[in-house]
Amino acid sequence: MTFDAAAFSVFDVDGLDGRMEAIRAQLWPLFNKYGRSIAEHVQLRLELEQPLFVHVAKHLRRTAYAPESTWVAIGGDKRGYKKYPHFQIAINAQYVAIVLACIDNPLHEKGIAADFSSRASDFDDLSFDYVLIADHTRVSYEALSEVDCKGFFERVASVKKAEWMIGRVAQPGSAELALNGISFKTKTCVFPMTVRTINIKIFVREVITASKTDTTIDNGNFAMIAVINENI
């Protein structure tokens, strides 16, 4: 996907109004393009009847400070995405991140974390360039290979405001950000795990069975995670 110098330059613009104008001009077209592409791909791979929703961050609650990062989320429902695990393309002054995100205390967060913790060794199958972002409000990240995944997800399951994003990052000027469109290589950044890794499809069925009285559950929102098992 193409995020060039102009895309990163939005973070050089001072002030909320000026930066938002730059974000709308430079980034929203990219977010809509790549967000729809990912949504269509996931829907096709999982044979979902309903399309995945694409939510471009509007930052409407901001009244003074310019956003230091911005993003598009793929998943959730018509009203939003934060209460569901979702895919996300995010950009800040240092990198573009393509991740699976579980932030802002989504539905079944503790169950997901407990399942991930019990299968922590499966993360060893991921390639060396995977990262963990433990706070979506900060730019810092850790190489996933250096993280105690079992301990980390045990903490997520027990701490109310714990969160995580797992995926890959690409710096300005990198080959990954110079591609025209979402290529095969970039798709592997979004849907990267092999069939040997975490079998979320089993967990999905368990969640839905255990929570069948919760009318907010949409199978597509959880099935979206299952695509990570695919080696596309």
Where are these regions (language model features)?
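A generic structural motif
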Residues: 95, 104-108, 170-176
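Long, solvent-exposed, polar/charged low-complexity segments
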Residues: 1-46, 138-208
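A residue-level signal for beta-strand positions that form part of recognition/binding surfaces
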Residues: 71, 129, 163
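Beta-strand residues in well-ordered beta-sheet regions across diverse protein folds
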Residues: 90, 99-101, 167
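Compact, glycine/acidic-enriched structural inserts
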Residues: 97-145
